[in-house]
Amino acid sequence: MPWLQIRLAITPDQAGALEDRLLELGAVSVTFMDAEDQPIFEPDLGTTPLWSHTHLLALFEADTDADALLAHLRLLRGGELPEHQVERIKDQDWERSWMDNFQPMRFGRRLWIVPSWHQAPEPGAVNLLLDPGLAFGTGTHPTTALCLEWLDGQELAGRSLLDFGCGSGILAIAALLLGAERAVGTDIDPQALQASRDNALRNGIDPARFPLHLPADLPRQPADVVVANILAGPLVQLAPQLASLVRPGGRLALSGILAEQAGEVRAAYEGAFVLAPTTEKDGWVRIDGVRR
């Protein structure tokens, strides 16, 4: 069955009203997708976590009048529409175009992120199976890649890890597959925790090795390794808390930081950590170090 798809480039503050209106106009589904595989940041309590650049995809039955839909949306927006695209698609094209965007990716020497519908290119490597979706972080964004490459280079055997702002769980699961004994994940969004749980099961991770918590329920036990891929502002605000969650001699890796923000973040952590030189990738950076 063919479908009419409307794609809108939106910001988080536009999401609620547009979603409600599109459903009222007959959309059979409304989906939010990350426009750039950006890291999820900590949203305000009670809000839906979205990326700063988000694509809204609304699917309608094929005989829907696209011009009438756009006219309704234009009225809702005071005569203006966000950047948009209208196309008619087949079921098979819809599925194939989505799946073809995600190919296996290698990080460091050992680690591969493999969409679950692909064969692992190196069956003997450390292969993390992942279904890209709402669950925040597929490995394609530089910040995720920086963290995965760092984890691949660490000696994790027998270590404990905390993934602060775990999203899909990709970093914690990678650490467990690379030899960590236990990982704890925390995220403000319950959907992210469920996605982390699902991804862990897909990779054969015993739930006892990967407990998940909302921030208010997070145990205050320091870990050997802490990773936090969120954004610079929250990282600066959370510096005392994150420092307290790394044991003396333990390691910390931070990302979600633009290159021009590195100085501010380093200043917030250099009192508690011996920091390595900043690592940059495509305008984003990773800051890592050892707890004093």
Swiss-Prot record:
Question: Matching NCBIfam families, A to Z?
Answer: prmA
Enzyme Commission number(s): 2.1.1.-
Give the organism's phylogenetic lineage.
Answer: Bacteria, Pseudomonadati, Pseudomonadota, Gammaproteobacteria, Pseudomonadales
Identify the gene encoding this protein.
Answer: prmA
Family per record: Belongs to the methyltransferase superfamily. PrmA family.
What this protein is reported to do is described as: Methylates ribosomal protein L11.
**Protein's cellular compartments:** Cytoplasm
Q: Which GO terms describe its cellular component?
A: cytosol
> Which InterPro entries does this one have?
Ribosomal_L11_MeTrfase_PrmA (IPR050078), Ribosomal_PrmA_MeTrfase (IPR004498), SAM-dependent_MTases_sf (IPR029063)
- Please name the GO terms that the record assigns under molecular function: protein-lysine N-methyltransferase activity
Q: What is the species of this protein?
A: Azotobacter vinelandii (strain DJ / ATCC BAA-1303)
**Which Pfam family is one of those matched by this entry?**
PrmA
SUPFAM superfamilies for the chain: S-adenosyl-L-methionine-dependent methyltransferases
Q: Which reaction does it catalyse?
A: L-lysyl-[protein] + 3 S-adenosyl-L-methionine = N(6),N(6),N(6)-trimethyl-L-lysyl-[protein] + 3 S-adenosyl-L-homocysteine + 3 H(+)
BP GO annotations: methylation
Which keywords accompany this UniProt record?
Cytoplasm, Methyltransferase, S-adenosyl-L-methionine, Transferase
Residues bound to S-adenosyl-L-methionine are: T144, G165, D187, N229
Q: Which Gene3D superfamilies match?
A: Vaccinia Virus protein VP39 (3.40.50.150)
Q: Which EC class heads this enzyme's classification?
A: transferase
Write the protein's name: Ribosomal protein L11 methyltransferase
